[in-house]
């Protein structure tokens, strides 16, 4: 990732409007800022959320609160708790997210 032509700025995430995305079950609320080619999001998954697709996009993802289960298409699963993160490249392992009780994430892609 190359970050250029981006002056210093501050984001108050509580002031960024949320956009709801339905999952197979539950919903995700995205608060999104776009900085050139870099998308930065604060995301809340509701309890019982299951993503409706296998994602192929690369991300840096940090769990801020709650627990996230990330499943890879090869069957591996990972439980992430607050302070844990993962990183994956574009087109690398297909992955999808779920949570039993809800989770808050910070994602850069």
Task: Please describe what each predicted stretch is.
Residues 1-42:
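A short, N-terminal "cap"/entry segment at the start of jelly-roll beta-barrel domains
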Residues 53-56, 60-82:
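A short beta-strand-loop-beta hairpin characteristic of the jelly-roll/cupin
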Residues 28-30, 40, 58, 67, ...:
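Short, acidic/polar N-cap/turn motifs at the starts of alpha helices
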């Amino acid at each position: 990732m190359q970050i250029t032509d981006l002056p210093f700025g501050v984001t108050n995430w509580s002031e960024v409007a949320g956009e709801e995305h339905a999952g197979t079950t539950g919903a995700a609320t995205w608060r999104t800022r776009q900085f050139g080619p870099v998308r930065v999001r604060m995301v809340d998954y509701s309890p019982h959320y299951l993503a409706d697709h296998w994602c192929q996009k690369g991300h840096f993802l940090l769990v801020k609160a709650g627990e996230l289960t990330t499943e890879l298409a090869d069957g591996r699963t990972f439980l992430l708790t607050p302070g844990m993160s993962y990183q994956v490249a574009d087109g690398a392992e297909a992955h999808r997210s779920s949570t039993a009780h809800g989770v808050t994430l910070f994602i850069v892609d």
